[in-house]
């Protein structure tokens, strides 16, 4: 598992949030809207077994934490497969089509699943474990820490 924490800094300091994308429904999305807010970026792919294992827990944790913005960043597949994944797991938060991998590259995501946890002060933690799915409890604990 790779865990990297960014040093606390002003919310406007993270240039990685200066991206634009397209939601799975075709609407524009601007990453800068996440500045200064607790947020979770979840990098996933529909064929990924760990992503499939995590998805129900991600859906529940997102629903239980309306004060934290969740954004899924899907890649390595076509939009139809991405939409089916979102529908299958009831992911009722914004999911982006990053088919070209540009947002993944911006965050140096080598493989899925991966997370970036943003605190309101702009500091962040990157978590990427290629050997197992994150448990719902670990995800819940990490999300709770964003508000403290």
Residue ranges and their predicted role:
Residues 52-89, 99-103:
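Structural microenvironment flanking redox-active thiols in thiol-disulfide oxidoreductases
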């Amino acid at each position: 598992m790779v865990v990297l924490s960014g040093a606390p800094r002003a919310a406007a300091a993270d240039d990685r949030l200066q991206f634009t994308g397209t939601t799975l429904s075709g609407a524009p999305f601007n990453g800068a809207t996440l500045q200064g807010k607790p947020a979770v970026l979840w990098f996933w792919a529909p064929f990924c077994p760990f992503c499939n294992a995590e998805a129900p827990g991600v859906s529940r944790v997102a629903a239980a934490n309306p004060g934290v913005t969740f954004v899924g960043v899907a890649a390595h597949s076509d939009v139809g497969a991405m939409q089916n994944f979102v529908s299958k797991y009831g992911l009722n938060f914004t999911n982006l089509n990053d088919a070209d991998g540009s947002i993944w590259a911006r965050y140096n995501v080598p493989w899925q699943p991966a997370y970036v946890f943003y605190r309101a002060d702009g500091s962040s933690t990157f978590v990427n474990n290629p050997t197992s799915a994150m448990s719902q409890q670990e995800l819940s604990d990490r999300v709770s820490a964003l508000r403290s």
